[in-house]
Amino acid sequence: MVQAARKFGYEGVELRALAGSLDLLSRVEFSAPQLAQTKAYFEDEGIEICCVDTSCTFHSSEASERANQVRIALAHAELAAKLGAPLIRVFPDKIQPGAQRDETRDWIAECVRAVAERMPDGVDVALETHGDFASAEAAAEIVKLANQPKVKLIWDVANSVAAGDTIEQAGRVVQHYLAHIHLRDAKPVTGSEHWLPVLAGNGRVSFAEALAVIRELNYDGYISFEWEKYWRPEIEAPEVALPDFTNAIRNLLEDRSDTPECSGVGK
């Protein structure tokens, strides 16, 4: 991961999976005996950890399961703090059978507030535009309801476009809560609710428009390239997609001096 980031011109990585495992907490690299060594390795290589991704969702109709997800999120927050990462990512996510949208929204808001209130210093919880709350308005509404300054947003541009947002519209909505950005090109697939990640310029997510909006927001965080090979084995290998993204972004930039940082993501 670190060597790929260096090779392809990324300044940071977003931790999601390692050696095929999505359970970062079970990895020996992040265990107490090896954690300091792992942190030092990233620092020595000059690669920042910009976010620790969880699989946590807060949509369950069972209060006990939501409480369990809060517990898991907080465990990831402790890991992030020890690694010097400023964020953890959580999902909203899907309205469950028999549940209503408004009550699901309220459950999610309650859970992210509960996480935020117990976060270690220097780490925020960031809700991704994802699932049934992928539109900027839907995700931002949850952040407003949570009403906790440590609750932020991850703007997944492709997800919000797939949910019907324009990039300009979404940017206006997320700007006050924005902590992190996921960017990839993608296109709809017949018979699937999920858009397929594609190489830059082959889908419906305009990098040019995204960069223009990001500049207007005066955003100074990471733009994290998300390549979902783990879930979509048919797409190109990371060795193809990682340099394709950085080349596409850099070709669009007229003035690199105010460029947001580009981050590889382990997806």
Residue ranges and their predicted role:
Residues 2, 6, 35-37, 41-51, ...:
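Active-site acidic/histidine proton-transfer and metal-coordination neighborhood
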Residues 24-29, 66, 195-200:
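Short glycine-enriched, charge-decorated loop/helix-capping segments at active-site entrances
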Residues 21-25, 58-63, 94-100, 162-164, ...:
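A short acidic, helix-capping loop that chelates divalent metal ions and anchors anionic groups
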Residues 16-18, 54-57, 93-95, 128-132, ...:
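Active-site beta-loop-alpha junctions enriched in small/polar residues
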Residues 1-11, 136-267:
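Histidine-acidic metal/acid-base catalytic patches
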Residues 10, 15, 47, 80, ...:
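A structural motif
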Residues 14, 51-53, 89, 126, ...:
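Conserved beta-strand positions in the central sheet of alpha/beta enzyme cores
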Residues 10-29:
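N-terminal substrate-binding region of glycoside hydrolase catalytic domains
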